Amino acid sequence: MKSFTDLQEGLYDPNIFKAFFLAGGPGSGKSYVVKKSTGGTGLKIVNSDDIFEKYLAQAKLDFKMQSSQSGERDVQRARAKKVTDKRKANYIEGRLGLVIDGTGKDFGKISSQAAGLKQIGYDVHMIFVNTSLEVALANNKQRKRVVPEKLAMNMWKQVQSNIGKFQQFFGPKNFIIVDNDMPDLDGRLFDHVFKKVKALLSRKVDNWMAKAWMNKELKLKQR
């Protein structure tokens, strides 16, 4: 059962019923893009990577992702996913605005999640962070947690193969591509992306399911 504070946060969240799916392979710079394009909006970030890396450090496992540690690493990944899924469920229960971080390699998984959110009244969008393979591999080597190069290449190819599918699923007006090959030295790129995100967030909630939920929660609050 939600507390009074949780109820208020959901009902009066300025970005209620808004969800942004983030796609981009290892080395695409997704975390930086999220910070620059959604920072200050109050959207809740759903990302198991930070928790996973915390658990890796606690277990004293190598961030170079050595194959000899795959079993122990999978245990920590499962722990991180469990915590993240619980947080996500709590956010969704309050219908809070979300940024759901992922690689985008599995179109079926993301489209299924997005469809589920749409069924309860969410507006769903995607921010697709695009880079060349060369840039992605170079950036991957500079990451704290390095993905093996062969795996990074395969993931990049999988993500790239889904661009058209994602654009068709979310629709051109709800699909933002960020070309992140070159450094955004003057800030124009991220300023442009931020404005696009803000424009999507500013759309009024018009879904009947969302409105019904809001009316129900308001009545509960007034009791």
Where are these regions (language model features)?
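Conserved substrate/cofactor phosphate-moiety recognition/catalytic segment
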Residues: Y32-L96, G108
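Proteolytic processing junctions in secreted/extracellular precursors
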Residues: K2-G10
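Conserved phosphate-donor/acceptor-positioning beta-strand/loop module used by diverse small-molecule
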Residues: K118-N139
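Conserved glycine(s) of the Walker
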Residues: G29
